[in-house]
């Protein structure tokens, strides 16, 4: 791998969220954790929020600012706070919500622990995620991007032999439903909750759903592979493949016309995009991304970029700017 200054690089999978590597196109985002036995990708969508479109401002006609000021000056803070909460402040702002988690799990147990040359990284010049390692003489490679041009997330897995045997499971932390469709496709659909309390505010019902209310959303995942495919509920099973390409997209009915069907939209998008070769999608993504990325360049001097990103961060915390970053 290229460990240039514009490359985030790790020699182990992420163990926590802030070690995962981000991809996004301004609408659909993904956090890639990497992994050998189980890999995880968390997705989010820009328009997936709680709420149902109601006016959350305070309609009280008792907005007596002078009384509040007087209470504060008299150090009667409880009275001032009570009046503010009842007559001035509106309800909580809406909560931004996670969309889904995709797990890629090996179908068989590893008999040996010797993994050679594990590496995962993010090439900032091309917005490409890459992961490589060797196991029992077989080379495994992953590459992923989130295309602004075609509005899809794409992940390619490749092995030097027909050694890719995976279960791909799509789940949502919301009350979504995942169904297998034709053409090696999973479709996740659901409605966002109408109310989500802040995590620091304790109440009896911190998350509230209401049937038919809340933002409707959908996410689609389609597989193209040289292996055998079987779909069972929320899982795609793949056997004896040497190459797998995953294409995913998502949408919601936020600020859309009445009758907008997110599930139909993502199904149509996947159908249209699946006819494009992986290399074409990759080239279109890089060209669109670099139009913005290459508009300027910031040089901060030489850096010891042979170290992994987590090692550079650790040294920076310990030593400051002593040529470690």
Task: For each feature predicted by the language model, list its residue ranges.
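Aromatic-residue-lined binding/catalytic grooves and analogous aromatic/hydrophobic interfacial grooves
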Residues: 1-325
């Amino acid at each position: 791998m290229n460990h240039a200054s514009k490359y985030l690089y790790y020699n182990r999978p992420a163990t926590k969220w802030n070690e995962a590597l981000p991809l996004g196109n301004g609408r659909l985002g993904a956090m890639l954790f990497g992994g050998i036995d189980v890999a995880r990708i968390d997705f989010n969508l820009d328009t997936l929020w709680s709420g149902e479109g109601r006016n959350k401002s305070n309609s009280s006609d008792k907005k007596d600012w002078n009384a509040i000021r007087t209470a504060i000056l008299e150090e009667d803070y409880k009275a001032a706070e009570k009046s503010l909460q009842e007559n001035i402040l509106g309800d909580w702002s809406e909560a931004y919500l996670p969309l889904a988690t995709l797990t890629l799990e090996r179908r068989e147990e590893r008999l040996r622990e010797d993994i050679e040359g594990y590496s995962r990284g993010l090439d900032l010049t091309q917005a490409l995620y890459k992961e490589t390692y060797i196991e029992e003489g077989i080379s495994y490679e992953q590459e992923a991007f989130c295309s602004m041009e075609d509005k899809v997330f794409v992940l390619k897995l490749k092995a030097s032999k027909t050694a890719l045997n995976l279960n791909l499971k799509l789940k949502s932390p919301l009350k979504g439903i995942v169904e297998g469709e034709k053409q090696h496709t999973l479709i996740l659909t659901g409605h966002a909750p109408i109310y989500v309390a802040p995590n620091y505010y304790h109440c009896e019902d911190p998350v509230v759903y209401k049937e038919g209310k809340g933002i409707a959303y959908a996410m689609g995942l389609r597989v193209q592979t040289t292996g055998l495919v079987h779909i069972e509920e929320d899982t795609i099973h793949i056997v004896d493949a040497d190459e797998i390409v995953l294409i995913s997209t998502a949408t919601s009915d936020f600020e859309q016309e009445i009758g907008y069907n997110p599930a139909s939209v993502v199904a149509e998008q996947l159908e249209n995009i699946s006819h494009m070769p992986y290399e074409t999608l990759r080239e279109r993504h890089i060209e669109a991304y670099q139009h913005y990325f290459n508009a300027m360049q910031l040089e901060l001097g030489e850096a010891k970029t042979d170290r992994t990103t987590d090692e550079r961060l650790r040294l920076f915390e310990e030593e400051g700017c002593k040529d470690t970053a």
